[in-house]
């Protein structure tokens, strides 16, 4: 290996390490701010300190603080008012309570519902996506890959990818439906049980590849291809979860909502 190649590889690894540090740091700052909101240090309606004040408090750059604020905004905990500041609009506990009365549905029933809804969302998103939307999806996908290489059991980027697709449609009803489907997942005891069995990164790696296929279709504005890619992605998830399931479990719903490789309407 030449000296120049070694330098290039060193620079590439350094850049990746720095990106990983940034991702871990903004998540940590976001969690600390969420704790402050939960503990009542900042109440609903309160204005959060400025970027400069938060960066000085935690000893991080203002860029890190900005990313943490975006994280809180995505989670609907704060609202950014241009020219005014960032305000607390909800607490983490209120969001949890809001969805605590949702029924515990089986994972395969949930995946079937997601398959029907999200394939249409992907189709529409392919027609609506802007350059900014594509860039956002790429950033989320890169975060998924980084979390995988770090062997972190963190699937937040997976959720962000699917929610970002719904937001591209600019249809608030679709966004709310998508958010609720994810809450069904978080409330599902059987889903949690199955998820705990996904110990091999191979599964997550395959799903990231599916996300790349979906993104490529959207980037090409190929609505039909985007719909089929999303349908197949969730079909792949169903197949893997079926393999991991205990079919003797009385709550197993895999036979009621079985695999269906055919995309409806094609």
From Swiss-Prot:
One of its GO terms (molecular function) is DNA binding. Keywords: DNA-binding, Repressor, Transcription, Transcription regulation. Residues 23-91 form the HTH gntR-type domain. The keyword Cell membrane does not apply. It comes from the Bacteria. Pfam families: FCD, GntR. The keyword Metal-binding does not apply. Residues 51-70 bind DNA. PANTHER family: TRANSCRIPTIONAL REGULATOR, GNTR FAMILY, UXU OPERON TRANSCRIPTIONAL REGULATOR. Repressor for the uxuRBA operon. This is Uxu operon regulator. It comes from Haemophilus influenzae (strain ATCC 51907 / DSM 11121 / KW20 / Rd). The gene is uxuR.
